[in-house]
Amino acid sequence: MTDPFNRQIFIDMGCFLQTLKISATETGHSVNFDILPQGENGPTAVAKFSKGAMHDPLVQFITSRHSEKEAYSNHNIEQDKISELSNHVTIIADQQRVDALRQITWDVLEIEMLTPRTLKESVDLMRIGKREINENPDGIELREPMLDALYNLGLLTREMLLDTDHSGFRDKMNAMQRTSFATPAFAVLTTHGNTRHDQINAGRNWMRYSLAVTSLGLGTHPMSQALQEYPEVSTQYDQVHQMLAKDGETVQMLARVGYELNAIATPRWAL
């Protein structure tokens, strides 16, 4: 629904490939990739390992990296850290554009949550409470203790989460809005084109950015809703591209970035 052309899927695959390349340096291996050797419908990549790689210092942050989806401190990011992150992405920290992006990212998130078919896509991927999160540590986790208790008592159901008039739904929306606006800066990644190779390379660059964020003691949270290509968010898609992309460029990633108030690790499957 929200990723009709599978653009985000190919970015995800690029993230995996870069994680593989970085982690291989732990054993002194370098990895060269043949990307999409049989075209879009074949393998994503063929990886060739060889000895002799230098240790990548970002490898130590792979297991602690996570998407920090909570509110950020209003503490501004120091210029030296912005400069470090600018090796990977563009950091938007000026107040005028930050304010505009806060509003756009909230507007488009609200649209996604109030559009029945895209809301259902999200609800289907939700993991409600500790039990569901532990059984399937992927998707969209709802970890708040109160939600966990209500769900276990049968006082919260997926049907309720699809009811936009329900008080619980409105409370969740209000919490999401507060989080969206508690953002001191944004990270932006663009590509000159929008081919599958561009998307995979965007994912590879994004992984290095994400690990660099962790190394600097910051948090980041992708806000991809405004970059999605379904009709209901076309206005926000155009707004973001007019603001952040040069002629012919595609904004592949947009994320909140800042200091975490209460860092909570994202659930993951065991290795």
Language-model segments: which ranges?
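Acidic, surface-exposed loops and disordered segments
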Residues: 1-271
